[in-house]
Amino acid sequence: MEPDGVHAEQQFILNQISCANTALQRQREELASLVMLHACKRGLFCPVKTYKLSLNASASEHSLHFEKSPSRFTLVNTHAGASVRVALHHQGASGSIRCSCSHAECLPVLLKTLCAFNFLD
């Protein structure tokens, strides 16, 4: 055993943690850029734009988690002296979309799948 065995082992573990953090940061940046580039007919009301998204990826599975907290929206419009009040209540939703592939390029497909959900509106 070499004299700096413990030091070398600690350095190896720190390098592994650093590499994992770098990969996670890269995935977050890729997700953020794909969300910004996403364009569909729903515009700003698309689940891709309105939900909080996070990505978990391993070598054999990718998982896109989405979450939206409950919210209330009230709009008052006055037309010809009469006011119309619209109150919308969203109960919130959360879930995940999983892909069991080994390709790193499936994130756009996961986002398109989330966009296609009609029950999330």
From Swiss-Prot:
Domain of life, per lineage: Viruses
BP term (GO), one: symbiont-mediated perturbation of host defense response
Swiss-Prot/TrEMBL keywords: Early protein, Host-virus interaction, Inhibition of host caspases by virus, Modulation of host cell apoptosis by virus
InterPro entries: Adeno_E3-15 (IPR004985)
Keyword presence, DNA-binding: no
The family this protein is said to belong to: Belongs to the adenoviridae E3_15 family.
Entry function: Protects virus-infected cells from TNF-induced cytolysis.
Identification of the protein by name: Early E3 14.5 kDa protein
Organism: Bovine adenovirus B serotype 3
